[in-house]
Design a protein with these regions (language model features):
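Bacterial N-terminal signal peptides that target proteins for export
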Residues: 1-10
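Formylglycine-dependent sulfatase
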Residues: 10, 15, 23-428, 432-433, ...
């Protein structure tokens, strides 16, 4: 008997005995898994991709994989703010990592875990869920203060441990960041993600008096690219695959697009700079990223094991997301912060017992801004009227259902992108545009915005973007 049928049977019995249905229905638990900087170059999306993610695939087999899931903003703070508050950047005014005006709203601002707490849940968490606070140590207290009954802070890339030579262990010096940003710890137990998952495992092994909202924020594969040595054995440097990087790729890109690509140009330029001394420096960086992403996947596996062992899987909603993607040398970028596909396309999976069909796939473009209202509906909680997103439950029930809500991405005020099943349309604050045909150009090498034969396509996408942005 499925979890949904059990709840229906229990409800019927309670009604016959005179107990209200609301009291009879068992609220589902929520396992909320965040991953930092995980792009789409994984086996979750294509078995031929180099980054091995068997546990993401294991999770997708239980529910619905959104093959076109996108962040609202390709930056840690604004993306997480959108997810955790339900407000997109046009509402929150959180466009960049340095923007924190949203917290000035005070009591009127109700975060996602806080909303669950207000409706009878216990909310606990660990790791990186909100963006880091002052000094980069721990989640922003303005987000955590009212959100959790208990929270174990994210305290950095790893616990205190030995410092290894960055060049010898994977990358040449990049400014003053060599040893701290491009090597890895020798022992898994020194990884902060180990602590995060261990906390979640302990919570899942406990007896609960209330339904639980449990969040686990996995920091990898965010810089620094640490992973246990045994993980690197799966990614030998001689087999490291680089993304395609045609020369002069940015020649047809507007100035603002180039500037966004080079937001942290020191990373890309220093990798190239060191090539005469180490021709494989870019390969080493990509190798380190791949190993870090693989390690993050293994942490997801441990979370699923703990949930299964707890016996609560049939009554637990699971949502997994990455805050944004990541460039690995493509588009002259080794970070995020652009409006191109690789910086915005992310793993996004929802498992909702009794609602999602195991192994289902939804190809509709959607954004993570929809997580807040979706979890409320799945949990039977009243909707929050001022959410900017929309519940994905219709797509969870039927992945081919009509979905009229456009997938909009923003990077900085006035710079927006619209993704459809075929097109990525970008418009910057100065009016300059880009258009890419993903049916024929998945790496976005040819900007079609200046091609008159695509005038009708651009006009239609421009109108959709105008309507979507004007609503905020």
């Amino acid at each position: 008997m499925t979890a949904t049928n059990k709840r229906l049977l229990l409800t019927a019995c309670m009604l016959l005995s005179g107990v209200p249905a609301a009291a009879a229905a068992e609220k589902p638990n929520v396992l909320f898994i965040a991953i930092d900087d995980m792009n789409d170059w994984t086996t979750l999306f294509d078995k031929n991709n180099p980054i091995k993610t068997p546990n993401l695939e294991r999770l997708a087999a239980r529910g619905t994989l959104f093959t076109r899931g996108y962040c609202a903003v390709p930056g840690c703070n604004p993306s997480r703010t959108a997810i955790m508050t339900g407000y997109g950047p046009q509402t929150s005014r959180c466009f960049l990592n340095r923007d924190h005006q949203i917290w000035q709203r005070g009591a009127e601002l109700v975060t996602l875990p806080q909303y669950f707490r207000n409706h009878g849940y216990e909310a606990r968490g660990a790791g990186k869920i909100f963006h880091h606070g002052g000094g980069g140590r721990g989640d922003d207290p303005r987000g955590t203060e009212h959100s959790w009954d208990d929270f174990q802070k994210h305290i950095g890339a790893r616990k205190k441990g030995p410092n290894y030579n960055g060049y010898r262990r994977g990358m040449p010096g990049i400014g003053g960041l060599a040893a701290t940003h491009y090597d890895w710890g020798e022992h898994e137990q020194k990884m902060v993600d180990y602590d995060t998952v261990e906390y979640a495992e302990k919570v899942m092994a406990e007896t609960w008096d209330k339904p639980m909202f449990l969040a686990a924020g996995i920091f990898k594969p965010h810089l620094p690219f640490y992973a246990p040595p045994e993980v690197f054995e799966r990614y030998p440097i001689d087999a490291t695959k680089l993304p395609p990087m045609p020369e002069n790729d940015l020649d047809d890109v507007p100035k603002i697009g180039k500037r966004l690509a080079h937001t942290e140009f020191f990373v890309y330029s220093n990798v190239i700079k060191y090539e005469p001394a180490d021709p494989r420096s870019l390969e080493r960086m990509v190798q380190c990223y791949q190993a870090s992403a693989d390690f993050a996947d293994s942490m997801v596996g441990r979370l699923l094991d703990a949930l299964d062992k707890s016996g609560r899987a049939e009554n637990t909603i699971i949502v997994l997301w990455a805050d944004h993607g990541y460039h690995l040398g493509d588009k002259e970028s080794c970070v995020k912060f652009t409006l191109w596909e690789k910086a915005n396309h992310v793993p996004f999976i929802i498992v909702a017992p009794g609602v999602t069909k195991p192994g289902s796939v939804c190809d509709e473009p959607v954004t993570l801004l929809n997580i807040y209202p979706t979890l409320l509906e799945l949990s039977g909680l009243p909707p929050k009227a001022d959410n900017d997103g929309h519940s994905l439950v219709p797509l969870l029930k039927d992945p081919e259902a009509d979905w009229p809500n456009p997938a909009i991405m923003t990077q900085g005020k006035g710079n927006n992108a619209l993704r459809t099943d075929r097109w990525r349309y970008i418009r910057y604050k100065d009016g300059s545009e880009e258009l890419y045909d993903h049916q024929n150009d998945p790496w976005e090498w040819k900007n079609l915005a200046g091609d008159e034969s695509y005038g009708d396509v651009i006009a239609g996408l421009r109108a959709k973007l105008d309507v979507a942005v004007a609503k905020k």
